[in-house]
C-alpha cells in the first residue's frame, strides 16, 4: 500500500508508533493491534456534521471547510511542523505510557472518520484551496435535500420523464388530440402548498400543450388542403399528358400513311417514266415482265390479200428462242433493203447491210410481223412510235415487244440527192416508203436479221437476181457510209445544243457492228451477218435450235 493513499487510517498512528519505538516501552492495550479503537466508526456519520446546525444552508460554501474534507497531506512531513503541532496540544495527551486511555480519546470532541485523515497544519496550509470533491458532494447533498422536501405518496417526478407521464398530472390522451386532467388526482393534506405550486406549473404546461396541439391541428388542416390541391393538379397534368400521347399516336399514324402514299406515288412516277416512249432505250426497266417463248402462241395464217412484199415472222412472235424473256433488241428506224418490183409469182429476198441513218429513213412493223403501207404527204420528217397491240400507254411493257412499229417519211435532202446522182444511183423516197421489212437483233450471235420468205421455185432466176442484188448491195454500201457520216454530223450538231435523238443513241450502240466488214466466221462476236430464214407459206416454221 502506498503511503500517499488517502484510505490509510491517520497520521496519529504513525506518531504513536514513532514514540513507542523511541521510548522502548510498550503499552499492554496496544497488544490488541488487530482491532484498534481508531478504526471504530462512530454511529454519527461525518456528513451529518454539516446538517447539525438547523440554520445550515445546503447551498453554502462547503468547499472552504477544509477541516472536514481536503486533499491528503504527504506523510513524510518535516519534523519541525510536528514539533509545532505538539506544542499546541496538551502534554497529557501525548504521554501514552502514563495514561490507560484508548487511542483516539484525545479527540473525543471530533468525529473520527476515514475522510478526516489530515493534520491541523495541513488543513491550515491548504485552507485557501477550493476542493472540487467537496463542491461535488455539496451539489449531491442539495439535490437529495430537495427530493426529501417533496412528500408525495406515489412516484416522484423525475426530470427524464415526459410531462404526459408525470403522475401528478394524471393526464389521459384522447383520440381526438386533446388532453384532459383526471379529477381523481389525490394529494396529501400536509402538502397543500407544494400541491398548489405543482398545480400551477401543470396548468401552465397544459395550456402550452393545448396551444401546441391547436397549432399542429391547423398545420394538419393546411396540409390536407394542399394535398387536395396537388391531387387536382396531378389529375390535370395526367389528362394533358394523355391528350398529348393520343395526338402523338395520331400524328405518327398520319405520318406513316403519308410516307406510304409518297412511296406509292414515287413508284408510279418511276414506272411512268420507264414506260414513256422517250425513255424506251435510254433507261433500264426496273419492273419485271411476263415470261413468254415463241411457242406460246399459235401461228396466224397469212392473209391472201396482204402485200406480197411484206414478210411476216414465222411464228408470229418477236421473241426468238428465249426462255427468260426477250433477249432481242428491236432496231428502230432501220432502213430496209432496196427491192426491185418483180413478178408476184417469182419473189426472192436477200439480206444486205442496212443503213442506220435514223434521221432520214425508217421502217415500221407491228408485233405480229404484218406491216401496213402508210404514205405521208407532209414534207417534214415524222417519227411515230406506237406500242405493240398488247400494250397501252400506262401498262407494263411485255417481254414479247422485240419490235416496235416505227413510221418515218421524210423527203430526201438536196445534198444527199446530188451525191447519189453523182454516184450513179438514185433511190426515191417513194421507193423507201413502199418497202417494209421486219428486223430483229440476235443478241446471242450479235447479228441483225431480216425475216423474209424464200420460194424454192425462184431458184431458176437466181443468177439474174444475184447480179441485180450485187449492184444494189454496192449502192446500199455507199448509202450506209453516207448515212453514218450524216448521222455523225447531226450528232455533233445535237451535242452542241445538248439534244440527243434516238438515231444517235442507236448509232452509238450499234455503230461497231455496222462498221465491221470482217467476214471471218470464227470471229462472230464482232461481225454482222445477213441470213435468210426459209419459210414455206403453207407449213409451220420449226426452228432447228429448239430441237436440241
From Swiss-Prot:
Ranges of compositional bias, category Low complexity: 189-205
Recorded GO CC terms: nucleus
Keywords: Cell cycle, Cell division, Developmental protein, Mitosis, Nucleus, Phosphoprotein
Region described as Disordered: spans on this chain: 67-109, 184-206, 358-428
Keyword Plastid annotated: no
Modified residues (Phosphoserine): 362, 368, 463, 471, 475, 483, 485, 487
UniProt feature, compositional bias: Acidic residues: 79-91
Protein's job: Has a role in localizing bicoid mRNA at the anterior margin of the oocyte during oogenesis, and a poorly characterized role in nuclear divisions in early embryogenesis.
Name of the protein this chain belongs to: Protein swallow
